[in-house]
């Protein structure tokens, strides 16, 4: 597919996403609200995106106002939806849950529109991250040339429906994204960045080429069978633990935006018990089990690329 067809399809899918999000807003707004609880987190200011987070103060909102905030959040996809002092590199987060009473017909209608919405989100992410063929540092320019001010992470995030949950409780998760990669994978990625011939701030084009060339040399010097890992820290994330009494099952969900709980009262479903998200303090985090990690040597800091050392 040529570039212009790709851009046209991206714009078309985004327009469809806006329509389905509006339809979802209308559908949910018409349903009887039985409970709503959302947790507002501090905004991340420009220039502070990469600072380690040690404390997060949580503000709770309940009832109709929580529902209003939650429904608005699903449609906050652009930079102009937030203050000028807020970082464009950090996605907005509003953990929580909105609980609605539904008939069988209403449940099917809502599930259909959520499924369609999530399919469009996944297709947009695939167009931008895979089909464009662009390395990550060039996607920003590609997206903002055609959808100016789009917050891609907010756009990609899927909407999570819950059917007759017994309880929804909240907490925090600290983790790393760890991925095994090959020497060839990394060289291909670096060469794609080099051949693109563009500058990536704060570097000039020449400085950027020099940096990438040095990284390529470092990787090429490794033996072919070297075990490589990308170990990228993920900032602390809100999560939800959902309990289903009948199935005796707990499901954990990432919770960057409100979950949508549908309660079928005519089938005897009760209002789920809702927990609270407490303030985060890194000093109070306790690990149930932390296995010994294999020793690693940092090779390419920009990519969080490590060489696994033999014990």
Swiss-Prot record:
Keyword terms: Cytoplasm, DNA replication, DNA-binding
Cellular component terms (Gene Ontology): cytoplasm
Chief subcellular location: cytoplasm
Subcellular location: Cytoplasm
Domain of life: Bacteria
One biological process term in Gene Ontology: DNA replication termination
InterPro entries (UniProt xref): DNA_replication_term_site-bd (IPR008865), Tus_dom1 (IPR036381), Tus_sf (IPR036384)
Protein family according to the UniProt entry: Belongs to the Tus family.
Function: Trans-acting protein required for termination of DNA replication. Binds to DNA replication terminator sequences (terA to terF) to prevent the passage of replication forks. The termination efficiency will be affected by the affinity of this protein for the terminator sequence.
Protein name: DNA replication terminus site-binding protein
Biological source species: Yersinia pestis
The gene coding this protein: tus
